């Protein structure tokens, strides 16, 4: 009897007006319990309410996600600040409202939806389910939806948006983030990620459409609506056909004795990399059996980010040794990024950094262009791009070879946007990259692409093998010709936003108000560029040429010794990242000296500017 009474009391509590003492929270609780139709996430909020956990309720319900460098990204779970059924429905309603305003032919052209293999049992939240709900919201409004019938690499969504002439698309993914996370990555009609003002306008529309519409929860529409189409076979076929544009040695590939191991990090990449190798004439790469199939728990790696290096590549490296394969290729869980490693003569593995791979890609794509260009092709119309925190090696190659190099803000959305401008003006973009192992060869896709990058590295390695040159040896040749570019990138974790803000504000008011530092330890600073405020001391008017980005922190220091160092916050994770590079001329070949100088400068940067002990920063652990 007592148990029944308690149950009745709890039931009454959950259906009565809420009196937490915080009117904003009371309203948010009521909205969530009325709107959420997912039993598991609804129960999470009910349990918090029942147990009087008002602080956690406030954290979950009284703030919303905002667009970062990769759209919406957060942990999966109950609450308006998390990725879940309700927030994805709200986001898609906002998307619909904005797209309806922007495109009079929205209901003729349609919308693309793709997804990876993430999922969380406790919130009954998976990428596939979120993709179906995204489609359902639009189908209920009579919008044609191209919903992939199975998981796909992230690059397939921007590719499909372009090829199908859709107005926009969404990929449900959190890429290489921890297993608890998911995301909502938005592409515009151009096939590039959205930039301002679209992101801000979409957020406004989301805030105006928070209550689910009739039909928004009806995921049965995915199975019954004649407006739902499956683009998988068509897009996969066209994508693989377009890959041939960046294949230059198919016959050589078919004869190579090199063997490759590929790991897809428990994600989507396996089938698509196998197909890409076939297109290029290769035998299939050897898959890592434990990591070949999708697994939302990423069971065999401590974090699903191949950028973390040898510690997360262990299974693939051991398999390569067993199979006598010299090159290991690792695509991240949504297959938009690539890591590569090569076995050296001393039996050790060389895991290439993103900047080192970019040096090889830059050399390779330009070399192939020179050998295959048409008679009237002009090198002055050729471009390569990189984000401003990435290596300057492409700049050095461009200066010597006569093509153009440009920098963009961090994030491939800026690269994609700039590529569109260049293509519209008759320019040719051969290659673009960001240091965090994001590469784009050619312009068939306007986002980073791990599938195409993997097979291009394989072709490069096979070509070099015919001359008895390894990837590492070719990298040295690139540096000897264009100048050594020695870089180091790492990060600190910081879970306190006020601490992050105070670190950067201190740098803006270092010795006195509105004065940036003139030295970092003993290292003299030549120029300072602050993207957050739009300041650049190297410009005559002291204004940055790159767009201002007030929502993120980013300061770049150029030193008198030729080093460039950037401190910035991550758009998707609680990190302060640092990027430092020594850019040497070709006559400076003492790498040990350059590395020692870089190490000393980084130590000074950390000690003087970040002050990890004082600020409670957590060192990256690998």
From Swiss-Prot:
SUPFAM superfamilies: Phosphoglucomutase, C-terminal domain, Phosphoglucomutase, first 3 domains. It catalyses: (2R)-3-phospho-glyceroyl phosphate + alpha-D-glucose 1-phosphate = alpha-D-glucose 1,6-bisphosphate + (2R)-3-phosphoglycerate + H(+); alpha-D-glucose 6-phosphate + (2R)-3-phospho-glyceroyl phosphate = alpha-D-glucose 1,6-bisphosphate + (2R)-3-phosphoglycerate + H(+); (2R)-3-phospho-glyceroyl phosphate + alpha-D-ribose 1-phosphate = alpha-D-ribose 1,5-bisphosphate + (2R)-3-phosphoglycerate + H(+); 2-deoxy-alpha-D-ribose 1-phosphate + (2R)-3-phospho-glyceroyl phosphate = 2-deoxy-alpha-D-ribose 1,5-bisphosphate + (2R)-3-phosphoglycerate + H(+). Keywords: Carbohydrate metabolism, Cytoplasm, Glucose metabolism, Isomerase, Magnesium, Metal-binding, Phosphoprotein, Transferase. Its EC number is 2.7.1.106. The modification Phosphoserine is found at residue 175. One of its GO terms (cellular component) is cytosol. It comes from the Eukaryota. It is an enzyme of class 2 (transferase). The active site is at residue 175. Alpha-D-glucose 1,6-bisphosphate binds at residues 73, 175, 336-337, 434, 436, 448. GO terms for molecular function: glucose-1,6-bisphosphate synthase activity; intramolecular phosphotransferase activity; metal ion binding. InterPro entries: A-D-PHexomutase_a/b/a-I, A-D-PHexomutase_a/b/a-I/II/III, A-D-PHexomutase_a/b/a-II, A-D-PHexomutase_a/b/a-III, A-D-PHexomutase_C_sf. It is found in: Cytoplasm, Cytosol. One of its GO terms (biological process) is glucose metabolic process. Mg(2+) binds at residues 175, 332, 334, 336. Belongs to the phosphohexose mutase family. Glucose 1,6-bisphosphate synthase using 1,3-bisphosphoglycerate as a phosphate donor and a series of 1-phosphate sugars, including glucose 1-phosphate, mannose 1-phosphate, ribose 1-phosphate and deoxyribose 1-phosphate, as acceptors. In vitro, also exhibits very low phosphopentomutase and phosphoglucomutase activity which are most probably not physiologically relevant. This is Glucose 1,6-bisphosphate synthase. It comes from Pongo abelii. The lineage of its organism: Eukaryota, Metazoa, Chordata, Craniata, Vertebrata.
